[in-house]
Design a protein with these regions (language model features):
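A short, flexible helix-boundary coil/loop motif
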Residues: 1-44, 172-188, 194-204, 209-213, ...
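Short, positively charged, Gly/Tyr-enriched micro-motifs
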Residues: 33-103, 112, 154, 159-164, ...
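Electropositive, glycine- and tryptophan-enriched low-complexity nucleic-acid-binding patches
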Residues: 59, 77-81, 142-220, 304-318
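Active-site-proximal, Lys/Arg-enriched surface segment
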Residues: 85-175, 289-293
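A short acidic (Asp/Glu
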Residues: 127-130, 233-240, 256-262
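Acidic, His- and aromatic-enriched active-site or binding-groove loops in soluble protein domains
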Residues: 245-256
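Short, conserved catalytic/metal-binding motifs centered on acidic residues
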Residues: 52, 66-69, 113-127, 155, ...
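Short amphipathic alpha-helical "interface-anchor" segments enriched in bulky aromatics
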Residues: 20, 117-123, 271, 279, ...
Length: 454
């Protein structure tokens, strides 16, 4: 074994980069090629630039700070060109990387645990007048008023332990701040960015079904699709069923949308006809006590479905499952997991830069949102496979400290060896020292992806 191999073998057991290990596991280089990320567009390897963006997010560094403090960073123009490149397929990159991660955690699932796909949307405030894709009068549940914002519809994966981001679309309403024809980039009609831009005026339900179909076609597996009452329309649920995905949802109490067969056609009428004859079970959610019962009902479009009527003493909530074999208690417990994604959005904003994109060009916004979600998935996966799972916030801070400490420590060590090598007598006595320094430096950069200035 040569000197190089001895050094690398010794360092491999000490100098471990969890992020780089995950990227290697999911074969990120292959995914980048499949997603049309090629070096010739920006002049640098796409893998290296992606890695730098991940480090910026995990280490909580602004791009300018990262460039200033890392001797291996590229010029700022390289990063800007990268996120504005119209030929890159960011959607495919996110879906394929998510599918690869989900395949890695598949053996960790226990019998009886449901794997869920969740469709939801979030609103990210954007005050700038010229931000492409942003709209006026977007309702924010957080602020309880209409604001200027991006409306992001997303497809997420969740189980009993983790959540992952699979796909997303930006939805633009009639109060858009800029027409699509006024967007900065003039795109070729066959480019990936043009295809992505064209979907912006589609309805939320259409975007959701398209995302679901793409995920299933790319190998994402799940037991149920969870949606809130906005998406719970018979035609939407029918299309999801046709894709082989049973739906669990809360229903809007709207007799125009939901009309059933038989004598009692509305949800209120069905509830009133059954409430005295059905056995009711009780439950507790926080401080709220409730009673519920379930019934199998015939619907003109969906056929036999199971409805769960949950009464808190004040409000009547109705849930639907197109899988009629599942118990009412399990339907309620499964639907509660839809709220996992709210914590996911919170982590994305607080830890991974979602909503803090300093770009107004549509292609750059798509790229930065994708990078935030991709980094979230990497950290979530690291948390999942650790023996002592933490909250993402705790793990995020650990990774931030670990990466920076490794980089600075190795840089200092190499500088010390370099100073030693400058002493003439030492170099004479140990001809391999310069070679050792070169190998240490090269291997450290390979393992970490960057080197900090000490």
């Amino acid at each position: 074994m040569g000197l190089d191999n001895y050094i690398q073998t010794a360092m491999r057991s000490i100098l471990r980069n969890p992020i780089l290990e995950v990227l290697t596991e999911i074969k990120i280089t292959k995914i980048l090629k499949q997603s049309n990320f090629v070096k010739r567009e920006v002049g640098y390897p796409p893998f290296q630039i992606i890695l730098h963006f991940v480090y910026m997010l995990v280490m909580n560094k602004r791009q300018s700070t990262f460039i200033k403090n890392s001797e291996n960073a590229f010029g700022k123009d390289a990063y800007y060109r990268f996120i504005k490149e119209s030929r890159y397929n960011w959607r495919k990159f996110l879906i394929l990387s998510s599918a690869a991660i989900l395949q890695r955690i598949k053996p960790l699932h226990k019998n009886g645990e449901h794997r869920l796909l969740i469709i939801d949307d979030t609103v990210e405030p954007k005050r700038g007048k010229f931000i492409e894709g942003s709209c006026k009068y977007v309702w924010s549940n957080k602020e309880h008023k209409s604001i200027n914002a991006l409306n992001i519809v997303s497809l997420n994966y969740a189980d009993s332990h983790s959540t992952f981001q699979v796909d997303f679309s930006i939805k633009m309403n009639d109060s858009k701040r800029k027409e699509i024809s006024e967007f900065t980039s003039k795109l070729h009609h066959r480019s990936n960015s043009y295809q992505r831009k064209s979907e912006i005026i589609k309805s939320k339900n259409t975007l959701a079904i398209e995302m679901l179909e793409r995920a299933l076609n790319n190998g994402v597996e799940a037991d149920y699709l969870l949606v809130d009452s906005w998406y719970a329309k018979p035609n939407f649920i029918e299309k999801a069923n046709e894709l082989g995905m049973p739906v669990i949802s809360r229903l809007p109490n709207n007799k125009l949308i939901w009309n059933f067969k038989g004598k009692h056609k509305t949800m209120n009428a069905i509830y009133e006809s059954l409430k005295n004859s059905r056995h009711k079970s009780g439950g507790q959610h926080g401080k709220i006590s409730y009673k519920y019962f379930d019934a199998i009902i015939e619907h003109a479009v969906l056929g036999k479905i199971k409805l769960v009527f949950l009464h808190t003493g004040k409000d009547l909530l109705v849930f639907i499952s197109t899988d009629i074999t599942i118990a009412g208690k399990e339907i309620i417990a499964t639907y509660k997991k839809r709220w996992n994604i709210e914590q996911g959005y919170k982590d994305l904003r607080n830890l991974f830069g979602l909503g803090k994109e300093e770009n107004r060009i549509y292609e750059a916004l798509i790229a930065k949102i994708t990078l935030s979600m991709f980094t979230y998935n990497i950290v979530s996966y690291i948390n999942r496979i650790k023996h002592e799972p933490q909250t993402l916030g705790e793990l995020f801070r650990d990774l931030e400290c670990e990466l920076e400490t490794l980089a600075i420590s190795m840089q200092l060590f190499i500088q010390i060896l370099t100073k030693i090598s400058e002493i003439q007598n030492v170099v004479k006595d140990n001809k391999d020292l310069l070679n050792i320094i070169a190998v240490l430096s090269a291997y450290t950069k390979k393992q970490l992806g960057f080197m900090c200035e000490s």
